[in-house]
């Protein structure tokens, strides 16, 4: 029986070597799909359903069932140990990526070597899986429920063995696989040690205080010092203001010292100024007296208005006196009067009258006896406008804003209706008024019934169109 089973087992094992070579090539292409393969392999029913049924004797069935049970348990142990190691590596990688986004070149080299080891492990696993698949294809699945129970029991035993024997699993592996696992573990430990060192260094730096933190502390200190200085400066300014106010009060108090006190500097200055000003006024009065004497000696007649002005000027105190035209050594009063009369004639304020003889004694009586002459209003250019009636003139001036502060009782004399400097004569003004009236009448005589809308009065009981050219115009009736 043993010989037959061995022969039966050797038969299907020969072509398996060829299949291994073919599957090696496939493994390189399918590296990017490790998760799907593991999910299929981890299921316990894979080897049971994959192999097609084959009719053999019951004695052969028993021997064949006992052989794969042992091999399955060993393979499952290998798969579990590899898968757990891979999951640890894959779980460690994302945590490292989170901790450090920009790894150092040393770390990159270590990661590359770890990736190479992982790829080699994957290849070896696929080889072992291919062997298991080939052996499973040679096995027979018995339709009896007893056979299924035996397989499930073997699976449970293998799980218990995995928990109890973790160390002997590495011994059961071939020497190359063991060396690879040890190298991977050493790399993983090295990486973890390097990360721990870097984290420790970062912690020390944080404890010591980075240069940025130091700069921030310095800035905060400077800001605090600046705030303290500002507060001190404000306090000092307020104190100085208070002191200044006290000093000003003292100075004001000193200025208002009574006259009896021995120290009165302000009053002394005022007195000296008054003393200086007094001789100036006396000097002016002396000069005026001298001028009067000179005029009497020369026989020049003096105006009463000038005398009054001179008398009123005595009350005023002259601070500064500017000299006028220095070219004329002697001011000719007669010439000045003649020039003023010519200006008045041209402006229309006074009529052309014969030169009058003035006497100093009778000047006041003659002026009182003569009626006051019209000196013109203060309305500027509207004084030159000619009006037919006095009422019309008053209305116009009121409309223009006149007589707000003056009484409208004054009237122009009839002789002053015509003046030389008027803008228009009577004839030209009449022509202008006629033309304006014609324009006004023409504008008012226009017919407003030509159109419709704002500004047009539509005739009642008539139909009109908004738009005659439009076909769909609306008819409106009143």
UniProtKB/Swiss-Prot annotation:
Keywords: Isopeptide bond, Nucleus, Phosphoprotein, Ubl conjugation. It comes from the Eukaryota. There is a cross-link at residue 250 (Glycyl lysine isopeptide (Lys-Gly) (interchain with G-Cter in SUMO1)). It comes from Mus musculus. This is Lysine-rich nucleolar protein 1. Residues 17-27, 73-82, 120-129, 154-165, 204-222, 265-274, 286-296 have a biased composition (Basic residues). Residues 1-231, 258-314, 340-378 are annotated as: Disordered. Its main location: nucleus. Pfam families: SMAP (PF15477). Expressed in testis. There is a cross-link at residues 7, 140, 250, 275, 287, 309, 323, 373, 393, 395, 427, 462 (Glycyl lysine isopeptide (Lys-Gly) (interchain with G-Cter in SUMO2)). Residues 33-45, 54-63 have a biased composition (Polar residues). It is found in: Nucleus, Nucleolus. The gene is Knop1. The keyword Cell inner membrane does not apply. Interacts with ZNF106. Residues 310-478 are annotated as: Interaction with ZNF106. Residues 143-153, 297-307, 340-357 have a biased composition (Basic and acidic residues).
